[in-house]
């Protein structure tokens, strides 16, 4: 059967629905609700380790299932990995990199009655390592690095493939369309994926801390002896700062360079210039460079530890439409 076209509806499986898997599940359902027909998924099946996780996933997606445009979702225990993968056209590996060995064991007996695309979301694990571990896999193998922003359709998803499992045009289009429904897609050579991951996925945590720090600087409970009447509630400060960050990103995406943007905002002797002097004194830019470099190195190191043991246990259940 064809994997994805304008008229066919593939089955998608997410094996190991942790934080990133849940975010992707939510993003795909929201895309189906807001843009029906953009990516035509017939059915979604996810596997989890525990009844508790199954309940959390169910609660998180329940409001989205009220829309008739949203495909049905099945939440199954992880010992169903093989059966779930056999019934899928696109299989996403959402477990931790340390669970690769366990996953290989689960999938060894699966039938290869039709061609499936395998997409790994595991941090630091190259397509080559996946191909080596799943030597019995006959279809295309792709590595995807996305962030939890897939839940709101704002992720940058970085994609690469193995030389041994180069994708045909149809498979490449299917993967591109799947992730384009939850953000922006960029294909890269595998050799660049570790460094790109540092700024494409991990950086959300860094940006969040920067936004929080800026907001705290003008918030009531963090004022340095200033008149509290002049301070903002933290929630308000966070909302303002987050929107300013969004505006910054939008300008940079329209080809405004960072240096030009700084020059547009900061005037000699002005308030912004005073703040920039603090950042320069504290060596913020150098700190961020070091942060990105260390994160990239740590991502590369993950591939060395892939294949150990991983997650937990659950009960079969179908998520009903609300």
UniProtKB/Swiss-Prot annotation:
InterPro entries cross-referenced by the UniProt entry: 6-PGluconate_DH-like_C_sf, NAD(P)-bd_dom_sf, P5C_Rdtase_cat_N, P5CR-like_CS, P5CR_dimer, Pyrroline-COOH_reductase
Keyword Cytoplasm: no
Transmembrane regions: 9-29, 117-137
Any one GO MF annotation of this record: pyrroline-5-carboxylate reductase activity
Pfam families: F420_oxidored (PF03807), P5CR_dimer (PF14748)
Keywords: Alkaloid metabolism, Amino-acid biosynthesis, Glycoprotein, Membrane, NADP, Oxidoreductase, Proline biosynthesis, Transmembrane, Transmembrane helix
Pathway: Alkaloid biosynthesis
EC number: 1.5.1.2
Presence of the UniProt keyword Membrane in the record: yes
Region annotation Disordered: where it falls in the sequence: 302-322
SUPFAM superfamilies: 6-phosphogluconate dehydrogenase C-terminal domain-like, NAD(P)-binding Rossmann-fold domains
One cellular-component annotation, GO: membrane
Membrane topology label: Multi-pass membrane protein
BP GO annotations: alkaloid metabolic process; L-proline biosynthetic process
Main location: membrane
Catalytic activity: L-proline + NADP(+) = (S)-1-pyrroline-5-carboxylate + NADPH + 2 H(+); L-proline + NAD(+) = (S)-1-pyrroline-5-carboxylate + NADH + 2 H(+)
Subcellular location: Membrane
Job of this protein: Pyrroline-5-carboxylate reductase; part of the gene cluster that mediates the biosynthesis of paraherquamide, a fungal indole alkaloid that belongs to a family of natural products containing a characteristic bicyclo[2.2.2]diazaoctane core. The first steps in the biosynthesis of paraherquamide is the production of the beta-methyl-proline precursor from L-isoleucine. They require oxidation of a terminally hydroxylated L-isoleucine to the corresponding aldehyde by enzymes which have still to be identified.
Family the entry assigns: Belongs to the pyrroline-5-carboxylate reductase family.
Name of the protein: Pyrroline-5-carboxylate reductase
Protein species of origin: Penicillium fellutanum
Gene label: phqD
């Amino acid at each position: 059967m064809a994997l994805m076209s304008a008229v066919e509806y593939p089955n998608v499986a997410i094996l190991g629905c942790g934080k990133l898997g849940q975010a992707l599940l939510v993003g795909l359902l929201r895309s189906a609700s807001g843009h029906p027909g953009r990516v035509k998924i017939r059915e979604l099946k996810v596997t989890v380790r525990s009844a508790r996780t199954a309940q959390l996933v169910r609660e998180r997606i329940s409001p989205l299932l009220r829309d008739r445009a949203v495909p049905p979702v099945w939440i199954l225990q992880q010992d169903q990995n093989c059966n779930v993968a056999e019934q899928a056209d696109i299989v996403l590996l959402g477990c931790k990199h340390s669970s690769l060995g366990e996953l290989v064991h689960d999938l060894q007996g699966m039938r290869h009655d039709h061609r499936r695309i395998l997409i790994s979301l595991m941090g630091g694990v190259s397509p080559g390592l996946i191909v080596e571990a799943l030597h019995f896999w006959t279809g295309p193998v792709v590595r995807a690095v996305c962030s939890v922003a897939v839940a709101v359709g704002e992720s940058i998803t970085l994609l690469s493939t193995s030389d041994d499992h180069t994708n045909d045009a149809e498979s490449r289009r299917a993967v591109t369309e799947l992730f384009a429904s939850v953000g922006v897609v960029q294909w890269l050579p595998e050799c660049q994926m570790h460094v790109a991951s540092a700024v494409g996925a991990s950086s959300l945590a860094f940006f969040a801390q920067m936004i929080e720090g800026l907001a705290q600087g003008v918030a009531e409970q963090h004022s340095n002896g200033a008149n509290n009447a002049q301070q903002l509630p933290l929630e308000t400060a966070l909302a303002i700062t987050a929107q300013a960050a969004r505006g910054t990103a939008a300008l940079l995406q329209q080809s405004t360079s960072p240096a030009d943007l700084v020059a547009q905002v900061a005037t000699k002797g002005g308030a912004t210039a005073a703040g920039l002097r603090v950042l320069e004194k504290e060596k913020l830019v150098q700190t961020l460079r070091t942060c990105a470099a260390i994160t990239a190195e740590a991502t590369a190191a993950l591939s060395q530890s892939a294949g150990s043991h991983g997650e937990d246990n659950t009960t079969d259940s179908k998520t009903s439409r609300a």
